[in-house]
């Protein structure tokens, strides 16, 4: 069983997934900091509140923390946009350059037609 586990862990795609999860977690921390420390204050200038996470409305004893939801939506949009850009970049790097079409070799019939056209041009010039 230990041997099977080692083989499973040693597979490339499992290691790639592990690295992706770690990098994703670190990236999430960066995005959270960006939203909390830069974007929220900028939006707060226009809305009149600097910290969205404190935005709450209460109905009876229920507290609706819509500010935290706004922060989560902003985080999601930033992460989704960055993932979109990364996928676009990866696809661009993976995509094979478009092969230029080879110049078509004229068929025998096309060669004869070209010769006839040239002869007609010469005949026209001589008359």
Swiss-Prot record:
InterPro entries: Mechanosensitive_channel_CS (IPR019823), MS_channel (IPR001185), MSC/AndL (IPR037673), MscL_channel (IPR036019). Homopentamer. Channel that opens in response to stretch forces in the membrane lipid bilayer. May participate in the regulation of osmotic pressure changes within the cell. This is Large-conductance mechanosensitive channel. GO terms for cellular component: plasma membrane. Belongs to the MscL family. Keywords: Cell membrane, Ion channel, Ion transport, Membrane, Transmembrane, Transmembrane helix, Transport. The keyword Nucleotide-binding does not apply. The gene is mscL.
């Amino acid at each position: 069983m230990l041997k099977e586990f080692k083989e499973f862990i040693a597979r490339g795609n499992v290691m790639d997934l592990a690295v992706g999860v770690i990098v994703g977690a670190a990236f999430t921390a960066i995005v959270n900091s960006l939203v909390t420390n830069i974007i929220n204050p900028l939006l707060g200038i226009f809305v009149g509140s600097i910290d969205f996470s404190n935005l709450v409305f209460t109905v009876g004893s229920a507290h609706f923390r819509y500010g935290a939801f706004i922060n989560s939506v902003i985080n999601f949009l930033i992460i989704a946009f960055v993932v979109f850009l990364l996928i676009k970049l990866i696809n661009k790097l993976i995509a094979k350059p478009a092969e230029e079409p080879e110049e078509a070799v004229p068929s025998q019939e096309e060669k004869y037609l070209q010769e006839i056209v040239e002869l007609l041009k010469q005949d026209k010039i001589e008359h």
